[in-house]
Amino acid sequence: MSKRFYWKKLRPIIISVVTCCAFFFILMAITSNRNGDLTIYVDRTSVTKSLSLSESSTLSNPKGKIYGPSLSEAWDTRMCEEEEDPSTVSCVPTDTYLLDGNNSGKHYISYTFYVFNSGIENLDYSMSLNIENTSKNLDDAIRINLYVNNALTTYAKKSNVTGEAELGTTAFESRDVIVSNTVTDVEPNEAIKYTIVVWVDGYDNECTNDKIGGSITLSMKFSVLGIV
């Protein structure tokens, strides 16, 4: 029997799960904030070395913190296969990274933004995508597509059965860190494009009834390096 779960937003803070027959009613909220379910922020800058964030490729309306979309309700889902139409099939489109800003659907979060050097000197920065909090191992069934300048990596927690990365994914870096890296020698006004796509993968063996009542909170942080 194929499994199918229904997700519904209950509060704008956590993923909260209850059950009704074979359904999950869940809030898909990725960070605790009042503006949306996804928060991206810069936590370290200086007068001459500074990062800013923008939803637009024109780098308009720069900010130190931006809020992504809220997901009100969704089924657990999967990535679309070739030639599948997400308007008629419950799946995550493969081309949302081509558009700026919020391109989320009913079943997934998709958000594109730009990190750019808003200072007057070249700089290096670190990026980390983190699990702030999770309960009932809901992170076992989460999938995250991270596009950096349109280059895709799919992240998932290691299989609890094999201890290896799930097929077609890169394993989370640690219990609390999905991925972290450093970008070097970014010139003034140079921008790096990021797209984050998040969904609960219904075809993951870990997407089971014991996740009912679970929650997860994520954050994404950018820090300028070399600031004294």
Where in this protein do the model-derived segments appear?
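Surface-exposed interaction patch
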Residues: 4-6, 12, 21-53, 96-163
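Feature targets compositionally biased, intrinsically disordered low-complexity regions
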Residues: 63, 67, 118, 162, ...
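Generic detector of ordered, mature protein regions
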Residues: 43, 51-53, 64-66, 71-73, ...
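Extracellular adhesion/glycan-binding regions together with long Ser/Thr-
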Residues: 3-9, 13-17, 85-98, 152-191
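C-terminal, structured domain-capping segment
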Residues: 93-123, 130-131, 176-228
